[in-house]
Amino acid sequence: MKKLYFALLAITFTACAELTTIMETYDIDVPLTEYEVSSGLKEALRVGTDSAATRLGAINGYYGDELVKIMLPEEASIIVDNISKIPGGNKLVEDVVMRINRAAEDAAKEAGPVFWGAIKNMTITDAFNILNGGEKAATDYLHKQTYDELFKLYNPKIQTSLDKEIVAGISTNESWESLTGKWNTIAESPIGKFADLEAVKTDLDAYLTEKALDGLFMKIAQQEKLIREDPVARVNDILKRVFGS
């Protein structure tokens, strides 16, 4: 009886394997398995995040790309205008901007493990939601899972760049705090309120960190769109199988 059972089992497995081979040979649609969807989505996320982090982590990854270059907030224009009036002032301002972007580039080099942790923990349900979601579904998943940890990675590096001296022993942060402190005193006074002046509440290092992360996720979204729409961007068989179906 046991021999008959194992013989039938062997025949069944052989038939299944042959059927799969025939379906693949003649390009007959084979439904995606849960394993394929999960593996394909994890690979897509790995490719997308590696590409984004590598590009932004290179010299001028942020600084040389106008789409993601991190600039001082609009409220800092008065600082920029005043420093620009002194000899060499424009270079001082641009040096600050460059240092901020260099800090973001350094942080991007270390973003990989943060993304990999989120990718590793992705469930089957997450995978199907991403597969059947919009063109930014994978990016949105990563944003939700990694943003706080990435903020903690980027923020200290940007904070350090802001604490460096720019002119006369004064750092960007000190100039910012002095400027906004004086402005807010006026804005919050009776005369300021009568004139409808608004206090500046921008936390400079937090603002710049958010801008850096906006750029990172923009690049990931671009890569996701490519993988979904362009067969050339599907660099291996599992991506072709999942996104080509």
Regions found by a protein language model. Give the residues of each.
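Bacterial signal peptide processing site
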Residues: 17-20
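Mid-length scaffold segments of soluble, non-membrane domains
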Residues: 94-164
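N-terminal Sec/ER secretory leader and immediately downstream segment
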Residues: 22-104
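C-terminal motif of bacterial Sec signal peptides marking the signal peptidase cleavage site
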Residues: 12-15
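Residue-level signature of catalytic and energy-coupling elements of molecular machines
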Residues: 52, 123, 231
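Alpha-helical transmembrane segments and their juxtamembrane interface "caps"
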Residues: 56, 110, 140, 150, ...
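Positively charged n-region of N-terminal signal peptides that target proteins for export
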Residues: 1-4
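A structured, mid-to-C-terminal "fold-capping" secondary-structure block
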Residues: 168-237
